[in-house]
Each structure stands twice: as C-alpha cells, then as structure tokens.
Amino acid sequence: VADMVAAEKIQLIVWGKDTIPNCKELFIPMQHEGGLVAGAFEEDGEMIGLVFGFPCSEQGVMHSQLVATLKEWRSQGIGTQLKWYQREWCLDHGYQKMRWTVDPLRAANAELNIRKLGGTCRTYYENYYGPMQGIDAGAPSDRLLLEWDMTSARVNGRAQGTPADVGFPQAGAANQVTDGVPTQSRLDLSDAQILIHIPDDFIGLAAGDAQLANRWRLHTRE
C-alpha cells in the first residue's frame, strides 16, 4: 500500500499539484485484476519512476496509461527501462500488443516512444481528454495513439540494441517555422517520408505563452 501512495505522489510532482492523480484505490484493484503498477526506486527506497497499465477489451492488448520519472532522474534511461520491463511483464502474462496515447507536440515523446521503443502511430485524436490541468494546461489535449507490437521485428530489434533511425535527410518538410512561430503548411506532399517541425519544449512554451501553444496545436492538427 505504501508503494501505491508513493505512486500517487509522484504523479503530482511530475504533472503538477493541480492535476487529479490516479489513486491507490484504483492502482490496487488494477494490480489484482491483470494490470501492472511498477516503480523504479532509489537505494533508500524512494520511488523515482512509475509505469502503469491495464488490460484492454481486445484480447492480448495492454493499455499503458502513464510512465513518469522525477525531474532530477531524467535523461538516465529510467523511463526507457520501465517500458522495457513493462514489455517483459506483458509478454510473460500473455499480452502481445500495447497501446497508449502521446502528445504529438512533445519531442521527448517521439524520442522515447518511436525512436527508442519502436512504436508506431496511425491514429490522431483531437482534444482527447478535454481541458487538462498542470503541465498539460494551455492547449487542446490532442493525442496520437501509439501502437507497440511487442513481438514485431522492429521492436525486437530495439530490445536487442539495434540503433534507432538517426534522421531522414531526403524527407520533405510539411511545415515552416519562423522565430518559433509556425507559419505555413504543405498538405500536398507525396514524399515517402515527411518531417513535421514541432517545438523543442512544448511544455515550457505552453506555460509561458498559451496563445502560441494553442496556435502550434491547431497548426500541427491541420
């Protein structure tokens, strides 16, 4: 139970005190009914990272609701390790696929979920959660649905250390940005690979300029 309370607290630290965290009264039955709540811990027992998922209605599919790492522990691969642990646990318990939603304007999401983990996205949801609080406030909550085929050659390769793609120099640019402001879109591209420019730090942008954050959201949604 103490770990579940710690899991509540880490959400408030990561997403902001104004958010409504998943509570221990949810975590505990989810854990008993086929879900997974797992943490990363410091040597003194402090929880520094968290991952949480639950079974989907579709057989053999897990939905991963969140992964979080305390700010002072980021850029050390902890979130990546939690996802690989989640994959191992899921495969051991009969799950072959995992899904979760990601903010398409957060560069760190693409780095972890697509490049490092080998996930793919085919579905775009507009304002998926409605208005949000904390670090997610300031713009509509558009999300990509990320699909993780945990037994695919792509994902197995990432798990075994195959280097992720490092760039697409021949890709066409779908939008233009001037001084941090999106200006033009090209919706007629037929290139096999297309690049979309996004902010380096959308969370910081939304905290400082909600109007510009909203402009970015509507621009990339288009």
Description of each model-found segment:
Residues 90-103:
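Conserved GNAT acetyl-CoA-binding A-motif
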Residues 118-119:
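Conserved Class I S-adenosyl-L-methionine
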Residues 1-71, 103, 125:
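A conserved beta-strand-loop-helix scaffold within acyl/acetyltransferase catalytic domains
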Residues 86, 110:
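Aromatic/hydrophobic pocket-lining residues that form π-stacking "cages" and hydrophobic walls in ligand
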Residues 93-95, 112, 122-222:
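Intrinsically disordered, low-complexity, positively biased terminal segments
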Residues 73, 77-85:
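Conserved acetyl-CoA pyrophosphate-binding loop and the N-cap/start of the following alpha-helix
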